[in-house]
Amino acid sequence: MSSPASSITQAAAGALIAAVHTAAARIGFAAAVAVTDAGGHPKAFDRADAAPFLTAEVALDKAWTAASFHIPTHTWNDYLANARVAPLAGHPRLMAVGGGYPIIDNGRCVGGLGISGGSYEQDQQAAEQALTALGFEVPAH
């Protein structure tokens, strides 16, 4: 699903967005979905008609955070409790809210996935379902 350049392909990014919308509908919410390449640059994006406009920026920042550090965004809550790491909370794009996951293909981070629109638990659930459906690895964090 990735290219030799170690980033997610456009086709895989589009399939991931479709899988997220399917999962979100099944769970019961309208989502904004962002996919970045391995460098955190936007690769694909879509916002459901019923998703609030703020979800667009949040989804992109979740994807960026996940791609940047190769860990799910919800794990940042524990890290930010450490006084030596806490200053990172002031970074304007860092998202410590569930719904952002690195896209792991054959052990390599090929991008980031960010979902916004449901509760953080719903965003996480939709991300995990979509990643699993397309054969990407879901980090154990």
Language-model region placement:
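Flexible, solvent-exposed loop/hinge segments and secondary-structure transition points
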Residues: 1-141
